[in-house]
Each structure stands twice: as structure tokens, then as C-alpha cells.
A protein has these predicted regions:
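Non-catalytic, conformational "gating/processing" segments within enzyme and secreted inhibitor domains
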Residues: 151, 171, 200-235, 429-431, ...
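Extracellular/periplasmic catalytic domains that process cell-envelope and extracellular macromolecules
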Residues: 29, 37-39, 50-53, 110, ...
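Bacterial N-terminal signal peptides that target proteins for export
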Residues: 1-12
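Proteolytic maturation boundary segments
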Residues: 12-45, 224-264, 306, 404-513, ...
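Short, conserved secondary-structure transition motifs
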Residues: 155-161, 251-265, 371-380, 574, ...
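M16 family metallopeptidases and their MPP-like homologs
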Residues: 47, 51-78, 92-136, 166-192, ...
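Histidine-acidic residue clusters that define the catalytic metal-binding segment
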Residues: 27-35, 157, 175-215, 243, ...
């Protein structure tokens, strides 16, 4: 039974208080996976993890795009969307409401081999998740009107892909790599197929594939196994099994040689994708492939990063290899550097792969890749969601029994295995080569994750590269956090440390910042802060950029120092035994960068390339224009963090040195360390490493207030080669320390700050079918937080979408908020308090923000009471005071109107 919201809010507050010591003394030790099969064929996999009072429930169906017949592509993904709609027992929105009232979060995704639904919530609310999943397993209503609306949402999502040339290239390259097998198709489906889907076809597919004997239920977390299985039998035991679903009979014919495809379109950036044939999950070569993937592309010290990015041939690179039910692919994705001839980049990739085929890899490269897997597994398994995701993915491909064997299998891989696999699979006759050739104009690319072009990625048996299509796009990390054994300590030199013990895994997480972000850029030097942050890791007095990257990546640790709008963000994660090394690495980079001239030259060139790509990205253009119109040129938030091209071109090494000397100092630095050490041990390590860093005492000038926004004409920017419009509305907001902040926060959460059940989502997505997602938020900056609405829609629906959004804002301001809405929003926010304790990095993220925004270290304890104090009348009053639909800047980035 679902309790009343106010009762649960009190329960969450108690749960947080009780969780303080539990987290401090918790252990990552856990029971083995237990397999139970019900008489109806439902397989249930349970695993107890008692480090936090959280449970996650994953329901996986063997129904992915590989199961779709010709002409029916995308039906798995459409059905995934419909399972968030009405059932015979629940109306549309009820699933989202129940999860929110339980203080949980939920989502789903469709992959090539399966579809997964997941709900994570406080463990005392497990029954809610089971009730939802058992109901929608067989009882989805598939209402014709709801299906029509949801098809519009999916088509909007599909059209959004056309804004990205990498997506366009990938669909053509994959369709060329596979001639017959369903892996050639888009998970989201081909447009004509999606448009032709009917209720009858979706219902037939649902009844054939969604049944207990074609599903797996994975439950991981703070549970008692026997009691949990009793609940599972109660909710699922009476569901009837069905006949086996139709088997996938299509097999890809043997390849007869290399294949090529070229896609042409608007833009200024070229992209290269190379797909090699790869074996199915369970093949003896799988783990050698996984290790080779790490050697080639995992981090700045990887083979291909050094061969292609450091030589200025590629601006970015990544790879895609994962376990798949049938023979699949190993793909490389490269963004060409401006001015590089296409053949030069392709030849360089071929030569790098040929070198491994002929010479093999070194013992150090092999050990580094194994170390990375060990570290990734440790950190991934530090959350119940990570464990459940891994178990579910393995069960869908090779069997969950592999869960406890992964690391041993990886350790058994030899250098000879790596060379044999490269020789076997990376030959020229086994590849499909795709090029996107720009023809002028603009089009938006997928931006690289890291400034140096390569990013740390999860190993192939953990990653879900196929899982890009979900019912509700993720809105980022946890909102709040709590922990026991937490201290705040200011070193004599002014550096602030927040240390928290959290032993959910044998690892630690670091989040932090230096008050040296782009808001500190001097006039005429926009981009200087971003460039400086990029360069602090590119060489010190004692180590080169390659040596710095190699030292950290060999341990399997991750470390980054990246410019954000307000600050320079610090992020690191490592196994417990490597904490001191990683801390020393961060100290060396922050305190003593050498800024080698050659690295400065390369970084300036890479920042220019990033500016070029951002100028072609509709979302980046919209953000830049919005802030340029919300703040005057004299305000530090007016300028974009990446800078202007002419300013970047003028930056010299001397500018970088001066900026670093002025703004990188201990009294401007905050470190948050959470993990498998006591706060006292963490403090001692930080004092040893940073204690002798001399302070600079250079205060920042006071920031001018945000000006009042009056009604402004719509600003429309056209970008050729696009298919969808990006809309951003923005106006004045509220400061974080305002006593009315929580009332405004809850009003916004009801309007558009949650997930599927907000008023804006209901009006524009569920009822209107105008967008895949629409969100509102108070943008988290220091000082007044602008209020923003963002959405993607078809160019022809821009006026209707904006009018609908404004109408919903007016309705909230004029008619108020119901007590039920307020309690749902409050319960959802309070529930995130528990869920944020799920892993170390999430906790560190929140504790960092409590310091940045001056909330106080006791913020997690005060948060429940602060929310409970808000009444519906106060929330409405806050909306009337801080959200003004008639005083919004309107930015629209859209394709040109057809002639």
C-alpha cells in the first residue's frame, strides 16, 4: 500500500539520520547472486547489498531491435515509451507519481538485444516497484490516442538525430556493415517504419515478447532475500507465461571484402567511422577484445590518442565495443582536425592498427588495461544500480554467472591474445569505412568529452553504448547527499577540505573546484580560463603531459581538471591504495604547471576547433545567445566559457602564466573527498600534499547584479542542415540564499523541474506530442539564478510549443498548486536524499555544491525540514514573484524555412 506523502517525507528524514553512521561503517561485502525461477518462467536474480538503505529493480525483456521484423523497426523503442503510459490499473502519469511519492527515480532504455526498465528507491519502498513492474508486464493499455501522441514524441526524438552529422554517418555506416542482420537498423527505427506503426502491430509485438518467460527481474540492494522473493511471488507468480517469442533467424552472410560509404551534408567538420566485424558474446576472444579496446582508446595515454589526437590529426576519438547476442562490431569514431586531408587521418588509423597486428602490445600497456578494468569494476559495483545493470546485461547476453568471473577472465588475457585478435579481426577486408564530408554551411556535431580529445570510458562488459534511447532523458546526478563522519576543515593556507567516510567500495572520489573559471577572464581574453584549465595537466616542472596521463591511467584512476562557467572543476576517482598518488598528481598540476609552448600552441588550436564545432551545435548556440541576452557585455556571465574566436587567437603563453599565478591559489580552492578512509586520514593526506602551497590573497572584484529583464523580441538563429528547433526561454530568477528559494524550487519542480510528470511535460509531450523533453530550472550560478525553459521541437511547432509553455506558466501563477502536487514534489526531492547516498562520486558532487553555494555542511540534515515548511500558497506566491512569462528572452535556433 502507498502511504500518504507527508508520512513518507517524515520517514525519509529519519532514514537520512539513521543512514549517517550506516554509511560511515558500511561495507561493500555482499551475498552471491541467487537465481530463482517461478513456475511461469520468470527468472529472478537477487543480490543483497547493505551499504545504503536503497534497492534497485531492473526488469529486462529479450525484446530489442534484433527482434524486429522488416518494416517494424523502432517498435521495441515505441513500446518502451508506451509502458510509461496507462495500464489497465493505472492512468497515464500514475507510474511517475508512485515513484516520486516513494522518493525514487526510474527510467528505461532500448538496446539492440533487450529492453530494460529500472526503478531505484528507498529499500522500504520495494513493493511499489514490484507493483508497477508486474502491472505493466502484461497490462499496458496501449490507448490509441496515447500511442498517436507518443509516436509524435518518438518522431521528434528521431528528427533530433538529424541535427548531428555523426548520427547520420553512423546509421549509414552500420547499414553498410550489416547487409541482412537487424543490427543494421536504428534502435529508434527508420522514420517511415515508425510512422506506419499501428496499435494492432504494437499490441501483437507486446503480447509476443512481454511475458514472464521472456523476462528477467534483477533486484539488488538493502533487501532480505526470502522476504523479497515472497513479494515477487505475490506480484508476479500469478501472471501467465506464454509461448516462446519468435526466434531471430536472420544471420549475416559472410563478408566478401571492405565496404565504404560517404555521407555529404552541411557543415565544416569531417568525421570518420570504421566498423570491424566482431564476435558474439560468449566467444573466447571477447575479453581480449575488451582489453584491446582499453589499450587503443581509453584515456590520453592510449595508443590511438597519442597517434591521432596528439599529432593534430583528430580532434576527438572514441570506440564502441560491447557484448552483443549475435556477431557485432568494434567501431572507431574520429573527428577530423580542420585542414587535415581525409586520407591522412584514415591512413594514420590504419597504420596504428597495423602496428599492433605486426608488433603486438607491451606488457605495460596490457597491465594498464587490466588495472583500468579492475578499478572500473570496483567503482561501478559501488552502487546498487551499477551492480544490477551489470548483472542484467550479462544475463541478456552470456548469462549472469559471468558476473563473478569477469576480472579473472581479464587477468588471463595475454599480449599474444591481443596480437592474435588484432590480426584476426582488424584486417582491411573485415572493415566498413564511413566518411561524413562537409559541404559548407553548418551542422552540429557531438562534442568531445575532454579537451584533449579522448575520455576514460567504461569497459565493454559494463557499457551500454546501445542504450541511447530512453523514455525520459536523464537530468544528471543526484540533487542532495548525506553521509556520516563528515568534517569541514580549512588549512592554514586557506584551502577548504570536506572529507566524508563512505565505504560502499574500496575506492575514493574527489570533487572540487578553484575559483578560476571563465567569469574571471580579462577583457579581450575570453577563453583564457578555459585554456589555462586545459593546460595545467599538460606538463609540469618534472613531468610531460604524456607522463602525467600515463602515471594516472596506469593505475586505473581517472582525473580531470576542466573549466566550468564559474569555476575550474576538479574530478578524480581511484582505488583506495592509489589515493596518495592521485592526490599528489592533482597538487602537482594545480600548483606547478609548466605550460610548455608546444602544448599551448596545440591547446589554442584545439580550442579553436571546439569553437567551430560549438558554432554548428544548435544547443550550444542557444545557450550562448541566451546568456548574451540575459546579461550585459560588462557582466562576467555575458561571455561564453569557450570564448570568442578573435580573443582566443590573441592568447599567449604569458597570458596563461599570469592568469594561473593570479587565480590558482589555496584560498580559492575547495576539495571534497569521499570514500574508503576516515576523515582524519583524508585530512592528514591533504595537509601533507597541499599544506605548503603558499596563498596569493587576490580577491575577485564584486559581481554586478543581474539586470531586470523586460519583454524582449524573439531572437531566431537559422542553422542550415538541421531538422529540429532548439528553444530556450530565460528571465530573472532567485538567489540560492533567498528565504523563498525552497518555495520557488518546489513550484518550478512541479512546473518543469522533475521528469515525466511535470506540468510542462504533460502539456507538451504527453498531451501535445510536440517534444521529446521540456525542462525548466533555476540555472545554478553564483548570485541570482536565471530561470530557464529549454525544449526541442519541430520548426513548424515552435510557436505552438512556446505558447503552450507560457500558458502552463500562467496557469500555475494564476490558479496555484494543489496540495497533492506539492507533496509529490516534496517527496521526490526528499527521496533523492537517500538515493544520492548510493555512490561516492554522487555524494562528493553534492557536498561540493553545498560549499560552492554556501549552504553549510549540515544542509542535507536541514533539507527535509526546509521543504516541509513550504505551503501551496507560498509556492504559488514564489512563482508569481520569481517566474514572469511576460519578461522572458526567447531564443530559437532552427533550420531555414523551406522556400
Amino acid at each position: 500500500m502507498i502511504s500518504r506523502p507527508w508520512q513518507f517525507a517524515v520517514g525519509v528524514a529519519c532514514c537520512v539520520a539513521l543512514a549517517f553512521p550506516a554509511l560511515g561503517n558500511g561495507s561493500s561485502d555482499a551475498s552471491p547472486i541467487r537465481e530463482t525461477v517461478l513456475p511461469n518462467g520468470l527468472k529472478v536474480l537477487t543480490k543483497e547489498l547493505h551499504a545504503a538503505p536503497v534497492v534497485t529493480v531492473w526488469t529486462l525483456y529479450r525484446a530489442g531491435s534484433r527482434n524486429e521484423r522488416p518494416g517494424m523497426t523502432g517498435i521495441s523503442h515505441v513500446l518502451e515509451h508506451m509502458l510509461f503510459r496507462s495500464t489497465k490499473a493505472m492512468k497515464t502519469g500514475e507510474i511517475d507519481r508512485l515513484v516520486q511519492l516513494s522518493g525514487g527515480r526510474h527510467n528505461a532504455y532500448t538496446s539492440y538485444d533487450y529492453t530494460a526498465y529500472h526503478i531505484t528507491l528507498p529499500s522500504e519502498r520495494l513493493e511499489t516497484a514490484l507493483r508497477i513492474e508486474s502491472d505493466r508486464m502484461l497490462n499496458c493499455a496501449l490507448d490509441p490516442d496515447e500511442l498517436k501522441t507518443e509516436l509524435g514524441v518518438v518522431l521528434s526524438e528521431l528528427q533530433g538525430r538529424l541535427n548531428d552529422p555523426e548520427e547520420l554517418l553512423e546509421e549509414s555506416t552500420r547499414a553498410t556493415a550489416f547487409l541482412m542482420h537487424p543490427y543494421r537498423n536504428l534502435i529508434i527505427g527508420w522514420k517511415a517504419d515508425v510512422q506506419s506503426l499501428t496499435r494492432e502491430s504494437v499490441l501483437e509485438y507486446y503480447q509476443a515478447h512481454y511475458q514472464p518467460n521472456n523476462a528477467v527481474l534483477v533486484i539488488v540492494g538493502d533487501i532480505q532475500t526470502e522476504a523479497t522473493l515472497d513479494l515477487v511471488r505475490q506480484y508476479f507468480g500469478g501472471l501467465p507465461g506464454g509461448p516462446p517469442p519468435p526466434p531471430v533467424l536472420t544471420r549475416e552472410p559472410a563478408r566478401m571484402g571492405e565496404r565504404r560509404v560517404t555521407v555529404k551534408g552541411s557543415g565544416s567538420t569531417a568525421y570518420l567511422q570504421v566498423f570491424f566485424d566482431a564476435p558474439a558474446a560468449g566467444h573466447p576472444d571477447h575479453y581480449a577484445f575488451a582489453v584491446l579496446d582499453g589499450i587503443l582508446t581509453n584515456g590520453n595515454s592510449s595508443r590511438l590518442h597519442k597517434a591521432l589526437v596528439e599529432t593534430d590529426l583528430a580532434a576527438a576519438l572514441s570506440s564502441d565495443y560491447a557484448m552483443r547476442k549475435d556477431p557485432g562490431w568494434f567501431a572507431f569514431y574520429l573527428t577530423a582536425r580542420a585542414g587535415v586531408p581525409h586520407q591522412h587521418l584514415e591512413d594514420a588509423l590504419t597504420q596504428a592498427l597495423e602496428r599492433i597486428r605486426k608488433e603486438g602490445v607491451t606488457d605495460r600497456e596490457l597491465q594498464k588495461a587490466i588495472n583500468q578494468v579492475r578499478a572500473d569494476l570496483t567503482m561501478e559495483y559501488g552502487s546498487v544500480s551499477g551492480v544490477a545493470r551489470a548483472i542484467g546485461k550479462l544475463e541478456m547476453t552470456v548469462g549472469h554467472q559471468e558476473f563473478d568471473r569477469v576480472l579473472d577472465r581479464i587477468r588471463q588475457v595475454t599480449a599474444a591474445d591481443i596480437q592474435r585478435v588484432a590480426r584476426t579481426y582488424f584486417g582491411p577486408d573485415s572493415r566498413t569505412v564511413g566518411w561524413f564530408v562537409p559541404e559548407g554551411g553548418t551542422t552540429g556535431p557531438r562534442l568531445p568529452t575532454g579537451g584533449r580529445g579522448s575520455a576514460h570510458h567504461r569497459p565493454a562488459f559494463l557499457a551500454d553504448p546501445d542504450a541511447g534511447s530512453g523514455a525520459s532523458p536523464s537530468q544528471g546526478g543526484p540533487t542532495v547527499a548525506a553521509t556520516g563522519k563528515v568534517i569541514r576543515h580549512v588549512l592554514p593556507n586557506g584551502l577548504t577540505l570536506i572529507a566524508a567516510e563512505n565505504r560502499v567500495a574500496k575506492s575514493l572520489a574527489i570533487k572540487g573546484y578553484v575559483l578560476a573559471g571563465p567569469v574571471q577572464d580579462p577583457p579581450g581574453k575570453s577563453g583564457l580560463a578555459t585554456l589555462t584549465a586545459e593546460l595545467v595537466t599538460r606538463g609540469t616542472a618534472t613531468q610531460t603531459a604524456d607522463e602525467l596521463a600515463e602515471r594516472i591511467e596506469f593505475l586505473g584512476a581517472t582525473s580531470s581538471i576542466r573549466s566550468e562557467r564559474e569555476t575550474v572543476g576538479i574530478t578524480a576517482q581511484m582505488l583506495t591504495e592509489h589515493f596518495d598518488v592521485v592526490l599528489g598528481h592533482l597538487a602537482e598540476c594545480l600548483r606547478a604547471p609548466a605550460f610548455p609552448p608546444d602544448e599551448v600552441r596545440k591547446a589554442v588550436g584545439q580550442l579553436r576547433s571546439r569553437l567551430d564545432r560549438e558554432a554548428e551545435d544548435p544547443k550550444a548556440v542557444a545557450r550562448r545567445e541566451l546568456f548574451a541576452h540575459l546579461f550585459p557585455p560588462s557582466h562576467p556571465l555575458h561571455r561564453d566559457p569557450t570564448g570568442r574566436r578573435e580573443d582566443v587567437d590573441s592568447i599567449t603563453r604569458e597570458d596563461v602564466v599570469r592568469f594561473h599565478t593570479r587565480f590558482y591559489s589555496p584560498e580559492r580552492t575547495v576539495l571534497v573527498v569521499v570514500g574508503d578512509r576516515t576523515p582524519e586520514e583524508i585530512r592528514a593526506a591533504v595537509e601533507r600534499t597541499f599544506g605548503d602551497w603558499p596563498p596569493q590573497a587576490v580577491p575577485s572584484p564584486p559581481r554586478p547584479p543581474m539586470p531586470g529583464i523586460a519583454s524582449a523580441p524573439r531572437r531566431t538563429i537559422t542553422l542550415p542542415g538541421k531538422s529540429e528547433a532548439i528553444v530556450m526561454l530565460g528571465g530573472n530568477g532567485i538567489t540560492r540564499d533567498n528565504p523563498e528559494y525552497y518555495a520557488a524550487f518546489l513550484a518550478n519542480r512541479i512546473l518543469g523541474g522533475g521528469e515525466l510528470n511535470t506540468r510542462l511535460m504533460k502539456a507538451l509531450r504527453q498531451d501535445g506530442g510536440m517534444t521529446y523533453g521540456v525542462y525548466s530550472y533555476f540555472h545554478p550560478v553564483l548570485g541570482e539564478r536565471p530561470w530557464v525553459v529549454s525544449l526541442q521541437t519541430g520548426p513548424a511547432m515552435v510557436d505552438r510549443a512556446i505558447a503552450t509553455a507560457v500558458a502552463e506558466i500562467d496557469r500555475l501563477r494564476d490558479r496555484g498548486i494543489t496540495a497533492e502536487e506539492l507533496e509529490e514534489a516534496r517527496a521526490a526531492a526528499l527521496g533523492s536524499l537517500v538515493l544520492s547516498m548510493e555512490d561516492q562520486m554522487g555524494m562528493a558532487f553534492v557536498l561540493r555544491d553545498t560549499e560552492l553555494f554556501g549552504l553549510g555542511i549540515d544542509f542535507p540534515v536541514r533539507f527535509p525540514a526546509d521543504l516541509r515548511s513550504v505551503t501551496p500558497a507560498q509556492a504559488q506566491a514564489a512563482a508569481q514573484k520569481y517566474i514572469h512569462p511576460d519578461r522572458l528572452v526567447q531564443i530559437v535556433v532552427t533550420p531555414p524555412q523551406p522556400r
